[in-house]
């Protein structure tokens, strides 16, 4: 993998990780177009999530470092348990699906149809209440919102997040839909989806770096050993995370501002168009 290829894939990761369009699906498509394959590429696409989740921590640092608010961390833990448990039990099946662009295309289409109607299915509760994403959000407003998010709701949203194990579904879309189904406001559901991404993606990255076995020249190794096996790999890892971090910050700011005004419809249309294009490319053997 060249630095340019690493930058392209990192841009795709940063742009799509927190939008309801599936970052995994888009990276599979990007890899197919770039013609990059192999264990390091698979490791790289997961490891650069570290840069993306750091963007959430930086943007919401006041939230993450309120150590007196222990319930915030407890609710995140409850929300992440379903994905961690199922991810561990069905790791091989999930990895097999990651090799299928057809699965991505179908998931993009079906998810797009859902997003077209999501605002009608789950109308916004509490109209006229303070916007949690307003620039001058007060501490009391955030506390009020946190109190509405019970442990039960956190767990059920985490169950929705399991759907994102299917490539093309989108972790962001699944968890936001789960939040809205639990009667959270659209903006608060998106905010909690960002928070939930941090432990979920950190666990996935840690597993790929320190526990999962990869191959380097036919020899088994751990992820961090594969990254440090060559200067090129190390440079790609560092540059990829930096690019993913910067792009993710911009994408999150765009998304929360857009979501406040317009909702999910445009993302549904995009997913449907992207799914149709990918199906055509698969039928014509342009992408395999």
What are these regions, as identified by a protein language model?
Residues 1-288:
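Multi-pass membrane proteins that catalyze or facilitate reactions on polyprenyl-/lipid-phosphate substrates
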